[in-house]
Amino acid sequence: MKYGFVKVASAIPAVKVADSKFNSQQIDALIAIADGKGVQIIVFPELCITGYSCADLFGQTLLLEEAEMALMQIMNNTRQMNIISIVGMPVASHSSRMNAAVVIQKGKIWGVVPKSYLPDHKES
C-alpha cells in the first residue's frame, strides 16, 4: 500500500467454454503479471473458470469437478504470491448450484460469495 491506496486490477482472460484447464492457465498468467506489477487485488469476470455460456453443462457434475480442480490449480500456482484474486465459477452447495465469486490468496479460499441476482435472459 502506498499513500494509503490499494492497487486493484480487473482482468479479462481468454476463455474457452467448458475448458476449465485452459481458462485456469489464462487466469494464472494474468495473476502473475499483475503480481509482478504490484497489484494487490485482481478481479476476474463471473464464471471465468468455466465460461459464462455453458447452459445445460452447469447441471453436469463433471463440469463442476473440473472447475474445482482448476481453482485448486490456480491456488497452488499462486501460493507464493501476496495478491488477492477474485475468480468466478459455478459452485455446488447441497443440492443446488450457484454462480459465485471465490476470493483466494496464498493458496487459501478466503470467501465464496454467491451471485444474488440471476437474470432470466427473457428481460428486455
Model-derived features with residue positions:
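Hydrophobic structural segments
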Residues: M1-S124
